[in-house]
Amino acid sequence: MVESEDWLIVGKLVGAQGLQGELRVNPASDFPERFTTPGSRWLRGRKGGEPKEVQLKKGRQLPGKSLFILRLEGIDSRDAAEALVGQELLVPASDRPELEEGEFHLLDLVGLEARLHADEPAIGVVTDLISGGNDLLELKTSAGRTLLIPFVESIVPEVHLEKGWLLLTPPPGLLDL
């Protein structure tokens, strides 16, 4: 069995879709094949615990939304689907796609320090990544505030995974919200 620290959260089950047991998933992955290619996936309950293996039969993206619709083996009613809402969809960390030089996995940003200048102390730490039209970094400042920072190149021009920090060049007022 894969150890708990060796799992990647690739999505969260957020609702039932229709009456036939399909599930809506909010993705936490930039790789759509994690939701469309049949095969083994794992679910972990709202309170943690040991992941349970499930079989993805098929999946598709919901048109016009960032959500995916999944059909899991053995889940064939709305009630069965609703019982899974809130669980995390997992894959083994060993399933991470190989990246090119200079590329990184978005989930690797969590825990990085955020700096306004390379040679200055951090203003906070990235605590979460929120997927949407544009990904948002959730930043906890050293003053205890929580900020949402658009993860776009003009605002986050540099990411230094090996050094544990990223550079922010926010427009005026963004950090004051």
Curated annotation (Swiss-Prot):
The answer to whether UniProt assigns keyword rRNA processing to this entry is: yes
Q: Where is the PRC barrel domain?
A: 101-174
- Superkingdom, natural source: Bacteria
Q: Which UniProt keywords apply?
A: Chaperone, Cytoplasm, Ribosome biogenesis, rRNA processing
One cellular component (GO) term of this entry: ribosome
GO BP field? ribosomal small subunit biogenesis; rRNA processing
Give the primary localization class. Answer: cytoplasm
User: Which InterPro entries does the record match to this protein?
Assistant: PRC_barrel-like_sf (IPR011033), PRC_RimM (IPR056792), RimM (IPR011961), RimM_N (IPR002676), RimM_N_sf (IPR036976), Transl_B-barrel_sf (IPR009000)
An annotated Gene Ontology molecular function: ribosome binding
- What subcellular compartments does it reside in? Cytoplasm
Tell me which family the UniProt entry assigns to this protein. Belongs to the RimM family.
Function, as annotated, reads: An accessory protein needed during the final step in the assembly of 30S ribosomal subunit, possibly for assembly of the head region. Essential for efficient processing of 16S rRNA. May be needed both before and after RbfA during the maturation of 16S rRNA. It has affinity for free ribosomal 30S subunits but not for 70S ribosomes.
Alphabetized NCBIfam families for the sequence:
16S_RimM
Q: What is known of its domains?
A: The PRC barrel domain binds ribosomal protein uS19.
**Which PANTHER family does this chain map to?**
RIBOSOME MATURATION FACTOR RIMM (PTHR33692:SF1)
The record's note on quaternary structure and interaction partners says:
Binds ribosomal protein uS19.
The protein's name? Ribosome maturation factor RimM
Please give the organism: Parasynechococcus marenigrum (strain WH8102)
